[in-house]
Amino acid sequence: MIIWLSNFLEQYFPFFRLFEYLSFRAILSIITALSISLWMGPKLIRWLQNLQIGQVVRDDGPESHFSKRGTPTMGGIMILTAITVTVFLWADLTNPYVWAVMFVLLGYGAVGFVDDYRKVVRKNTDGLIARWKYFWQSAIALVVAFALYAYGKDTAATQLVVPFFKDIMPQLGLTYILLTYFVIVGTSNAVNLTDGLDGLAIMPTVFVAAGFAFIAWATGNVQFANYLHIPHIPQASELVVVCAAIVGAGFGFLWFNTYPAQVFMGDVGSLALGGALGTIAVLVRQEFLLVIMGGVFVVETLSVILQVGSYKLRGQRIFRMAPIHHHYELKGWPEPRVIVRFWIISMLLVLIALATLKVR
């Protein structure tokens, strides 16, 4: 929105030309989202406490988690508010890629909100019925997938980028829709599974968003895209502002979510953030790099799949408890140790993924 205003005012006040620079708007995006989160946090926490909207803890979970009962949840409202306000302030709202990410972010946020509401207000520990949750996740992802395919059909926007091979970029055709669907839904649920310890999910989300900010800038810059042998997609550059908003909002939320947490993001936050990251990965054509950068999310998800599969096939569990962060807790690791080590691994994976851009 501000960029529209600056286009008018710069003829009278040259200072407003600064808002045309992507880097300047990205910095302002981080600051704005961070400020909104820090300002909103205490108010939201008090409001949630007054409504007695507290975390539901499983009786069969680690004993260390029993003390978390009653901690305010649905803090993802803070994250989504900060991101939404920031994006509408600093992003170019004529860019369809911005709207695609925001549609998924808010759509999945709505699904997560209903799920959280049923859990903590209606006292239904199962939350939203699984088939309905999956239905709405699928519907939102398919709407975006079909829209993006129609918009970018037979262009660089629908090519498959294979790491390490600069000349292998086949057109996906209708397979693009299927891939987009699985990436968005899969990433959303992976982040949701990871959100089990104080600050565990938000920092990897911040790291991945920061990595995608660089990739979005490179993809939107024709010279840098050619240098790295990745598709040049002009619209992708505006996603830098969106990624910056996620980073700022994430840091602001971490202020209150760090151990011991004052608030949890809930499904309203984790489903939305995961869906947004998946959408960004699709838009910049780096689905494979998402698997590397989001390796923590991938491992958490695989641990659940392997645990359930092993128990059903062999009657035995592989881990003491899944997702895998609970396995390490039950092995005696203090919660902060699990969290920080997963953060370190996540940061390294993002750096490795960015390094692969040059290895072609």
UniProtKB/Swiss-Prot annotation:
Which CDD domains does the entry link to? GT_MraY
Coiled-coil region list: none
What are this entry's molecular-function GO terms? Answer: metal ion binding; phospho-N-acetylmuramoyl-pentapeptide-transferase activity; UDP-N-acetylmuramoyl-L-alanyl-D-glutamyl-meso-2,6-diaminopimelyl-D-alanyl-D-alanine:undecaprenyl-phosphate transferase activity
Predominant localisation class:
membrane
Alphabetized UniProt keyword annotations: Cell cycle, Cell division, Cell inner membrane, Cell membrane, Cell shape, Cell wall biogenesis/degradation, Magnesium, Membrane, Metal-binding, Peptidoglycan synthesis, Transferase, Transmembrane, Transmembrane helix
Q: Which domain of life is it from?
A: Bacteria
Q: Which GO terms describe its cellular component?
A: plasma membrane
Cofactor names: Mg(2+)
Q: Where are the transmembrane segments?
A: 21-41, 73-93, 94-114, 132-152, 168-188, 199-219, 236-256, 263-283, 288-308, 338-358
**Membrane-protein topology:** Multi-pass membrane protein
**What top-tier enzyme class does this entry carry?**
transferase
Location in the cell reads: Cell inner membrane
Question: What EC numbers are recorded for this enzyme?
Answer: 2.7.8.13
In terms of InterPro entries, this protein maps to: Glycosyl_transferase_4 (IPR000715), PNAcMuramoyl-5peptid_Trfase (IPR003524), PNAcMuramoyl-5peptid_Trfase_CS (IPR018480)
> One Pfam family this chain carries?
Glycos_transf_4
> Which GO biological process entries does UniProt record here?
cell division; cell wall organization; peptidoglycan biosynthetic process; regulation of cell shape
Q: In which pathway does it act?
A: Cell wall biogenesis; peptidoglycan biosynthesis
> Which reaction(s) does the protein catalyse, per the Swiss-Prot or TrEMBL entry?
UDP-N-acetyl-alpha-D-muramoyl-L-alanyl-gamma-D-glutamyl-meso-2,6-diaminopimeloyl-D-alanyl-D-alanine + di-trans,octa-cis-undecaprenyl phosphate = di-trans,octa-cis-undecaprenyl diphospho-N-acetyl-alpha-D-muramoyl-L-alanyl-D-glutamyl-meso-2,6-diaminopimeloyl-D-alanyl-D-alanine + UMP
Function of the molecule = Catalyzes the initial step of the lipid cycle reactions in the biosynthesis of the cell wall peptidoglycan: transfers peptidoglycan precursor phospho-MurNAc-pentapeptide from UDP-MurNAc-pentapeptide onto the lipid carrier undecaprenyl phosphate, yielding undecaprenyl-pyrophosphoryl-MurNAc-pentapeptide, known as lipid I.
Q: Which family does it belong to?
A: Belongs to the glycosyltransferase 4 family. MraY subfamily.
> Which PANTHER family does the UniProt record give?
PHOSPHO-N-ACETYLMURAMOYL-PENTAPEPTIDE-TRANSFERASE, PHOSPHO-N-ACETYLMURAMOYL-PENTAPEPTIDE-TRANSFERASE HOMOLOG
What's the name of the protein? Phospho-N-acetylmuramoyl-pentapeptide-transferase
Annotated source species? Aliivibrio salmonicida (strain LFI1238)
Upper taxonomic classification of the species?
Bacteria, Pseudomonadati, Pseudomonadota, Gammaproteobacteria, Vibrionales
